[in-house]
Structure formats: C-alpha cells, structure tokens
Amino acid sequence: MGVEIETISPGDGRTFPKKGQICVVHYTGMLQNGKKFDSSRDRNKPFKFRIGKQEVIKGFEEGAAQMSLGQRAKLTCTPDVAYGATGHPGVIPPNATLIFDVELLNLE
C-alpha cells in the first residue's frame, strides 16, 4: 500500500524537493490497464504544485518528494494514496491503482 517508485532515469541525486517548494514536473497518468487519463506532456506545459499543500493526490506528492532534480520515475499509487473508493467519476474508477510517469524538471 502507498506509493512505489521505480527510477526510469536518475536525477542529480542531491537536490530533493523541500516542504513549501514548488515542483515543476512533466507527467503522464495511467490506469493499471495502460489507459492514459491525463498528461502534461500532451499539453506541452509542465505542471506545478507546492510540496506539503495537498494540491495533488497523496501518492503523487509522496513520490515526487523522494525524487531528485532531473529524475524520471514511474510512481505506482495504490487507491489509499490516490482517489480511493470514490474514484474520480468519468475518469478514475473506484479503488483504482494509478501509474504516473513523472519527470522532476525544476524546483522553485
């Protein structure tokens, strides 16, 4: 249960997000069956969120907080750190495990 992080390509190994910092990421979100539900890459616009402010689902924030600058990783988020039993109607089914391909581009 929780978030599992699998490195696709390593970052600098030194610069990690701190509480209050803004993470600038590119991501693609998928269901376990591979169906894409969202992607900042498709919009060609990086996504920004502040660490510690619950602006994203818990698993996404927990995973990104453990990534170093420049790292690209696969985050597998179980329902307890995603959208849970409710899901997100029309997009995320109830009790769905979500997979994110996340690249930490910058910290502000």
Swiss-Prot record:
One of its GO terms (biological process) is positive regulation of cytosolic calcium ion concentration. One of its GO terms (cellular component) is sarcoplasmic reticulum membrane. One of its GO terms (molecular function) is calcium channel regulator activity. Detected in heart muscle (at protein level). Ubiquitous. InterPro entries: FKBP-type_PPIase, PPIase_dom_sf, PPIase_FKBP_dom. Keywords: Cytoplasm, Isomerase, Rotamase, Sarcoplasmic reticulum. It is found in: Cytoplasm; Sarcoplasmic reticulum. Residues 20-108 form the PPIase FKBP-type domain. Its EC number is 5.2.1.8. It holds the Pfam family FKBP_C. It catalyses: [protein]-peptidylproline (omega=180) = [protein]-peptidylproline (omega=0). Inhibited by both FK506 and rapamycin. Identified in a complex composed of RYR2, FKBP1B, PKA catalytic subunit, PRKAR2A, AKAP6, and the protein phosphatases PP2A and PP1. Interacts directly with RYR2. Belongs to the FKBP-type PPIase family. FKBP1 subfamily. PANTHER family: PEPTIDYL-PROLYL CIS-TRANS ISOMERASE (PTHR10516), PEPTIDYL-PROLYL CIS-TRANS ISOMERASE FKBP1B (PTHR10516:SF429). Has the potential to contribute to the immunosuppressive and toxic effects of FK506 and rapamycin. PPIases accelerate the folding of proteins. It catalyzes the cis-trans isomerization of proline imidic peptide bonds in oligopeptides. This is Peptidyl-prolyl cis-trans isomerase FKBP1B.
